[in-house]
Structures are given as C-alpha cells and as structure tokens.
Amino acid sequence: MTLTIAELARALDARLWGDGSLIVNGAAEAGQAGEGQIALATSPAYAEKLSPGGMALLAEGADPEALGLRAAILVGRPRLAMAGLTRAFDPGPGIAPGIHPSAVIDPTAELPEDAAIGPFVVIGPRVRIGAGARIASHVSIGADTVIGRDALIHAGVRIAHGVTIGDRVILNPGVSLGADGFSFVTPEKSGVEEIRQSLGERQEIRQQHWTRIHSLGGLEIDDDVEIGANSTVDRGTIRATRIGRGTKIDNLVQVGHNCVVGEDCLLCGLVGVAGSARIGNRVVLGGQVGVSDNIFVGDDVIAGGATKIFTNAPAGRVLLGSPAVRMETHVEAQKNIRRLPRLYAQVAELRETVKKLLDKGDVE
C-alpha cells in the first residue's frame, strides 16, 4: 500500500503540515523510521527520537518545524488515528482467492462466489457462508453453522455444529466456538453443592461420580465481534450462549455455557466467565478477571486486572481485588496493609511502655 502523506491525512480526517506529496509506504516507531515510513511520535518522549527530514504522526500542539520534519500529520486523538493508519497499511493474512483443492466441502454447503478458502479446510453439511469470507488453512466448520458477510477466520479455528456468526467477525488462530459446556452432576448432593450451601462446612467425605449433562443449546456471535487466539466460547445447555455486537475478546479467554455477553464489551487476556453469567453492555474486564457462575455484571462496569467477581455488580461500578470491591475501597485497603508493619511496631512500643509502667507500679 502506497499513499501520499496528504492522502493519508485525508483518510485520517487529520491536519497536514508540510509537503503533502511525500510518499508513505509504511509506519515505524520514532527513531526507527526509514525511507518512505511515517514515524509514530504522539508523545513528547517519542518526538525527541525523531530524525530530521522525515515524516511523523504527531499529537496536536506539537511543532513539526522545530522537530526538523518535512511533513507531519497532526491528530487530536492519537490512538484513534493509529487505528486508521494501521488499517491503511495492513496487508491482511494473504489468503488466496478461490477454493484450495485440498479443502473438503460438503456438497450441501452454500459458499459465496468470492470466497477465499485455504488448504485443508473442512466445511460440513448445510453450512452457509456469506459474501467476502476469507478462511485460512486447517479451519473446520461443523454442520448447520451460519456465517455472515466479510468473515475473516484465521488458521486452525474450530467451529462446532449449529453456531450462528454475524457479519465482519474476526476469529484469530486456534479459536474454538461451540464446544460442549462443562456441565456435570452427581446422583446425590455433591461436595461442591454442600459447601456452597454451608459456606465451607462438610458433613462427610464420600465417593462421587460425575454424570454428563449434554449441551443441546447453540452459540450466537453477533456482528463485528473479534475473538483472540486460543479463546473458547462454549455452547449452551438448552438456550444459546450469546456474544453481543461489537464485543472484542482477547487471547486465552474462556466464556462458559449459557453466558450472555452484551454489546461493545472488552474481555482481556485470561478472563474466565463461568457458566450462566450475564454481562451487560460496554463492560471492560481486565486481564485475569474471573466472573462467577449465575451472576449479573451490569452495564459499563470496569474491573481491573485479576479482579474476582463473586456476586452481582451494579451498573457503572469500578471494581478491583478479590473478592471484588469498589476500586477506591481496594486502594485504601492496600494502603492500610502497607501501614501494618509500622502500626505493629507502634503497638509493640506501646506495650513495652505500659509493661515498664506496670513493673514500676505507676499504673494500676
């Protein structure tokens, strides 16, 4: 992809400074930009590393002339501009048009004329795939699955039977969609059930054997969802598991059976959402956050990294810690924990003082 810097500025809806005819063929970090590359220097610390005579993406308020640049694009929101810039120069996964001869496609499957399907892809009976689909090598798609328009499915993705996927969905390598939920039951009350009711007390420990509850529900992924590498979303037991429009899921995330995740959520790496949990819209779960089963996390909740949510979380709450509490409560608690050694020393000193007074008989 090659653009003039003026064309790139227009694409980003940003202000151009300097020579708009310069050719841009890529981007690089400040101090590493070569010929034809625009340097990313949206903070003063990065701007100091710029080489004179080049091109840069700068935050509004920077002085390109003082930095010795030939041209610059000035933006009000640098990270949003980064989204547009990286999109302009992303070559994509390079999946060749057409259907690779090694692909195994059931004759009842419906594929678009413009499909790009890589080597060793397996597509099952009655699958329907929308226009513009790009499917990389070693992907398997189970029977009766429906995939919308402009899907990008990277290598090694596994999609089980009866999954419904919307338009413009991106699935990164190793994603697993629609596997059976983790549902098991014992003939008698299990130890897990007992301690959940008693909050830790056990009457007796006895043998128990697990019986599988089969997963008859489906999985519904809405439009514009992105799912990171090696993440898994299980199908429902009776009703469908659902992921809402525009939600982005990072690598190594587990979403359990029957879960409902709302629209425009962010689930960062190593998040685990247990079965039948419901998550509202625009929720952000930081890395390693855990959500207990059968609870509700309200709209616009933000949970910091490694937070463990065991009970319902009201809308708009900012959470941190294990168990999850308001962020300000957690921060204050951590401050108090750091004060404990000093407090311990003060108490020890007071005890010693009182002991001396008692020994001298000055205190009754």
Curated annotation (Swiss-Prot):
Gene3D superfamilies: Hexapeptide repeat proteins (2.160.10.10), MurE/MurF, N-terminal domain (3.40.1390.10). It comes from the Bacteria. One of its GO terms (cellular component) is membrane. SUPFAM superfamilies: Trimeric LpxA-like enzymes. Keywords: Acyltransferase, Lipid A biosynthesis, Lipid biosynthesis, Lipid metabolism, Repeat, Transferase. Pathway: Bacterial outer membrane biogenesis; LPS lipid A biosynthesis. HAMAP family: LpxD (MF_00523). Catalyzes the N-acylation of UDP-3-O-acylglucosamine using 3-hydroxyacyl-ACP as the acyl donor. Is involved in the biosynthesis of lipid A, a phosphorylated glycolipid that anchors the lipopolysaccharide to the outer membrane of the cell. Homotrimer. This is UDP-3-O-acylglucosamine N-acyltransferase. It comes from Paracoccus denitrificans (strain Pd 1222). The lineage of its organism: Bacteria, Pseudomonadati, Pseudomonadota, Alphaproteobacteria, Rhodobacterales. The gene is lpxD.
